[in-house]
Amino acid sequence: MDKWGLTLLSMVVGLGLLYFVSGDMIPSASAQSGQEEAGVVEINQAQFAELVYDYTQEGEWQFKGDKPVIVDFYAVWCGPCKRLHPRLEQLAREQKGEVIIYSIDAEKAAELSRRIGIRAFPTLLFIPVEGTPTLSEGLLSLKDLRQQADKIKGGH
């Protein structure tokens, strides 16, 4: 390979790595129905707009999913967020796809976080298929998470 080709290849690989590290190339959370065995699924703000709610459009809340959703807005430096994650993984295993659980690095998704009203970490967004979503700030116990999951599924 000549010097020009090697330089071009290096630039392409470097840009690809930069794109990946920036968080824009998170593995796709394609369809909610395919998330049943996945546990907590990391998404970015573009995926949130596609799968959950298009926050870029003005107007009333319009949920895009067909199953209840919990969205964990976290910060990588947040101790309570780190303690919450295993509880959410446990809840995802217990729910077996009845409730989809997404996780978003709120600092990388600053515009979304601002529009949703994230002011503290962790913040959970509980979204029923029909009705109004609710926000909960702070660390929740597994028992509280189960109760919230039951609520958004239409239970007690």
Locations of regions flagged by a protein language model:
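Hydrophobic beta-strand anchors of alpha/beta hydrolase catalytic cores
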Residues: 70-71, 101, 124
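Conserved acidic residues
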Residues: 105-107
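Short pre-active-site segment immediately N-terminal to redox-active cysteine/selenocysteine motifs
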Residues: 66-69, 73-77, 120
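A short beta-strand-turn-helix
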Residues: 42-68
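N-terminal targeting signals for export/organelle localization
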Residues: 1-46, 156
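C-type cytochrome heme c attachment motif
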Residues: 76-83, 114, 123
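Typically the conserved alpha-helix immediately C-terminal to a functionally engaged Cys/Sec
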Residues: 80-95
